[in-house]
């Protein structure tokens, strides 16, 4: 079985801020009763879950609309979600249990740490990152997750032909990400029509609906790993 690729990062600020969000009673009940069933943290458990399967990784899945949709539409796949906020995890656990989904696992930790330390090389087919924090203030741009180092890390974890699917409502962030991929010959740009039905027909997330209501422009970047 392939081993996790070691990429060395300089110490830098996290791309998220830990906060105590409100957790509903339903979310709390799901966290208490379903944690051991769906949450994985050990490298061996993650490797066993994704080994030899079509695997999608949803980074920062929020309320889990895309995560649940993918698990339902591709029951032959494994869907791994990375999320640091317990409210979103609680929502997903409740939905997954109600729908009797067996092909979902959740990792409650920083996505960069997960990729660097626990995901085997060349093991992921699709990575999704929808509406990550854009850190709009210039002094906070260093906190943005997608940097040149992160793209190299993504490359090492995706299979050849694997896809990175990114959405943001912040034009400056989109332009920055677009330039990074354009400068890297290991990636080829795709359009929505190039994707499978399970990726074309995902529901709008709650954040996406809010952005549309506020008339913020939605920007999409889809790239395929070619080298």
What do the predicted segments below correspond to?
Residues 179, 184-227:
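Class I S-adenosyl-L-methionine
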Residues 161-168:
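Conserved beta-strand signature within the Rossmann-like core of class I S-adenosyl-L-methionine
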Residues 59, 82:
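Conserved beta-strand/loop positions that form the S-adenosyl-L-methionine
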Residues 60-64:
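Class I SAM-dependent methyltransferase "Motif I" SAM/SAH-binding loop
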Residues 1-55, 65-72, 93-121:
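S-adenosyl-L-methionine
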Residues 146-160:
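A short glycine-rich, Lys/Arg-flanked "PGG" loop and its adjoining helix->strand segment in the class I
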Residues 85:
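Conserved SAM/SAH-binding beta-strand->alpha-helix loop
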């Amino acid at each position: 079985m392939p081993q996790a690729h070691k990429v060395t990062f300089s110490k830098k600020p996290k791309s998220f801020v830990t906060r105590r969000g409100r957790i509903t009673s339903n979310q709390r009940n799901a966290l208490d009763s379903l944690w051991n069933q769906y949450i994985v943290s050990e490298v061996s458990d993650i490797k066993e879950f994704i080994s030899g399967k079509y695997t999608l990784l949803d980074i920062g899945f929020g309320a889990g609309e895309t995560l649940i949709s993918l698990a339902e539409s591709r029951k032959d796949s494994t869907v791994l979600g990375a999320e640091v906020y317990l409210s979103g995890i609680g929502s997903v656990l409740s939905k997954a249990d109600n729908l009797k989904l067996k092909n979902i696992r959740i990792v409650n930790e920083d996505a960069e740490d997960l990729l660097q330390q626990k995901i085997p090389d060349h093991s992921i087919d699709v990575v999704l990152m929808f509406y990550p924090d854009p850190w709009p203030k210039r002094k906070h741009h260093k906190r943005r997750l997608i940097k040149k180092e992160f793209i190299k890390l993504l490359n090492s974890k995706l299979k050849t032909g694997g896809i990175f699917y990114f959405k943001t409502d912040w034009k400056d962030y989109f332009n920055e990400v677009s330039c990074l991929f354009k400068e890297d010959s290991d990636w080829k740009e795709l359009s929505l029509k190039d994707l499978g039905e399970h990726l074309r027909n995902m529901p709008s997330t709650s954040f996406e609906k809010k952005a549309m209501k506020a008339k913020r422009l939605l920007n999409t970047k889809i790239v395929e790993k070619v080298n």
